[in-house]
């Protein structure tokens, strides 16, 4: 598991889209959290399905009290996105020591 993303999942906190590299990977919104449910259960799959429907612009969902689920156009694209997400989560947590991360400028999250 990705340790920094897992911290967000354990806290049931979405990961804000503040890291510029996420934009380059196509992420333009916060990574949502799916409430905890036993893996493979109907509640789990329904929760993931609802999150994907509600947050169609997100390439990942955080699994409450568990970890992260990443999507991509290919396994390699998903793996690269996971690395970028983990970097973003680590940077967000480190930024807390400096007063917290700042949002990107207005319009930065708009589709180009």
Model-derived features with residue positions:
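Glycine-rich flexible loops
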Residues: 2-112
């Amino acid at each position: 598991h990705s340790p920094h993303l897992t911290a967000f999942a354990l806290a049931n906190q979405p990961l804000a889209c503040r890291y510029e590299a996420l934009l380059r990977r196509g992420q333009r919104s916060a990574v949502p959290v799916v409430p905890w449910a036993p893996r493979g259960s109907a509640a789990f799959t329904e929760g993931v399905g609802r999150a994907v429907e509600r947050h169609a612009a997100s390439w990942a969902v955080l699994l409450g009290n568990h970890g992260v689920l990443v999507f991509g156009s290919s396994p390699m694209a998903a793996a690269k996105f996971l690395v970028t997400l983990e970097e973003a989560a680590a940077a967000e947590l480190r930024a807390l020591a400096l007063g917290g991360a700042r949002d990107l400028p207005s319009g930065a999250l708009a589709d180009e």
